[in-house]
Each structure stands twice: as C-alpha cells, then as structure tokens.
Curated annotation (Swiss-Prot):
Protein name: Lectin subunit alpha
Keywords: Disulfide bond, Lectin, Signal
Secretion signal span: 1-23
MF GO annotations: carbohydrate binding
Domain of life of the source: Eukaryota
Disulphide bridges, residue numbers: C53-C157, C132-C149
Lineage, opening ranks: Eukaryota, Metazoa, Ecdysozoa, Arthropoda, Hexapoda
One Pfam family of this chain: Lectin_C
Species of origin: Sarcophaga peregrina (Flesh fly)
Length: 283
C-alpha cells in the first residue's frame, strides 16, 4: 500500500509534535516532598541550563545538606535509572586556583557551599577551565565533578529561591494576618457578648424600674382615692350632724313655740273666761 504526500506530511507533523511534547521535562516529586524538574537531554551548557530553569520560573538546584542530596539521588535513580551528567547550581566564580579546597558558591543564593559530594580528586579545575558543578555519569554513586561550563549536559531545576522565600514570607504574613484577624474577631465577639449582657441587664433594670413605678403610682392612686373617700365620708358625716342638729333645734323651737302658744292661749282663755264671767255678773 502506497502513502500519499499528504499522509507523509501528516505523519511528519504528528512526529514533530509528539517529539516536542515528549521532550518537555516534567516536575518530579522527591522523598523530601519537594518537586524538581530534570532534563536528561545532553544539549545545554551551564548558562543555557540556568536560562531553561528560569523559563520554567525555577533555578538550577542548590544542595545544602546530605538529606537533600539523598533525596535528589533517589529521584535521579527513579527518573534516569543511573548516574547522569546533570548541571547543578554551583560554580567557583571562575577561580584560577586548582586547589581542591577552593570555595564554590550556589549561584541562586550566593551562599558558599556548606555541603559537598565531590568525587575522588575533585574539584581539580583541569586546565583551569572547570568552574561549574554537575552530577557525573562516570561515578555510579552520583558524585559531583567540576567541569567546563560550556560542556553540554542535562540539568536539575527547583523552585526559584527568591520566589520560594517570598512565598514563605508572604505565607507567614498571611498566617500572622489570619491570627490577628482571628484575635480581633474573638475580641469583638467577646466585647459584643459583654455589651449584649450589659444591655440585657440595663433593659431588665429599666423594666423593673418601670414596673416599680407603676406599682408606686397605683399605690398613690389607691391612697388618694382612700383619702378622698375618707374626706367625703367625713364631710358627709359633718353635713348629716349639722342637719340633724339644725333639725333638732327647729323641732325644739317648734315645741317651745307650741308650748308658749298653748300657755298663752290657756292664760288668755282663763282671763277671757273670767272677764266673761264678770261681764255676765254685771250685765
């Protein structure tokens, strides 16, 4: 079966896309919980490797402890299967010395090496041209070597030191803000609860004063009504007593008048009767 030119072109495009996709290094999680990006293709000098890491918003790896070194060795074993030429982030600042003890520095941080995993008789600065640090494929123990910075190798990247430091500082600030906000919220809730209790107490006191006031007003009204009733009764009694006394006086006066009239009539009748008798005798 023959292939048309269109089929061939499609296959080539697919192969290019597949190859490009497959060549992109992926983040790998190590035993220390951190993620590293490992490029195994031997086509980058040290500076190119640095730039590649930067393009992924990362940096060439720094190894400051045996624990971190062991985690990276374990990761390389799992990803590559054996020791491999991989650029690290260290260099000797292009020192001309061939002293094995010459200082090396981690470029991402500027810090001098506090830990190293050199292979035997290294770093030797062979021909005064070896200034950059890498894991050496000729050493099965994944030991380090100094080499010409222009040699093509793979590389190992890790999260950017400054961004990681910034993120950590930002995280700490955020945590501090959360704690402060939580404290303020707690204090506000406590103050609000206290004010609510005080308000409830004041409300209860006002209600009690109002109730007591109503009771006192009612007592005063009752006392006033009783006093008025007593006054009215006293006035009525005085009026009755005065009326009774006046009536008795009138009755006594009438009786005296009657008696006086009767006496006068009787006396006048006797006189008239005597006069009549006298008249009868004379006439």
């Amino acid at each position: 079966m023959s292939l048309t030119m269109k089929n061939v072109e499609g296959f080539v495009i697919f192969l290019v896309i597949f190859t490009s996709t497959a060549a992109v290094p992926q983040l790998q999680k190590a035993l220390d919980g951190r993620e590293y990006l490992i490029e195994t293709e031997l086509k980058y000098n040290w500076h190119q490797a640095w730039h590649e890491c930067a393009r992924h918003d990362q940096q060439l790896v720094t190894i400051e402890s045996a624990d971190k070194n062991n985690a990276i060795i374990d990761l390389v074993k799992r990803v590559v299967g054996k020791s491999h030429n991989l650029w690290l982030g260290g260099n000797d600042e292009y020192s001309s010395s061939r002293d094995y003890g010459r200082p090396f520095f981690w470029s991402p941080t500027g810090q001098a090496f506090s830990f190293a995993y050199w292979s035997e008789n290294n770093p030797d600065n062979y021909k005064h041209q070896e200034h950059c640090v890498h894991i050496w494929d000729t050493k099965p123990l994944y030991q380090w070597n100094d080499n010409d910075c222009n040699v093509k190798m793979g590389y190992i990247c890790e999260p950017n030191h400054f961004r990681e430091t910034y993120d950590q500082a930002l995280k700490q600030k955020c945590e501090a803000i959360k704690i402060t906000n939580s404290k303020i919220s707690t204090e506000f809730d406590q103050l609000h609860a206290k004010q609510s209790l005080e308000f409830d107490s004041i409300t209860q006191n006002v209600a009690k004063v109002n109730e007591d006031w109503k009771i006192e007003i009612q007592k005063l009204q009752n006392a006033t009504q009783i006093a008025i009733q007593q006054i009215m009764e006293n006035h009525e009694k005085k009026i009755r007593d005065l009326s009774d006394n006046l009536l008795k006086q009138l009755q006594d006066s009438n009786e005296q008048l009657k008696q006086s009239t009767d006496h006068m009539n009787a006396s006048f009748g006797e006189k008239l009767k005597g006069q009549q008798a006298e008249n009868n005798e004379i006439c």
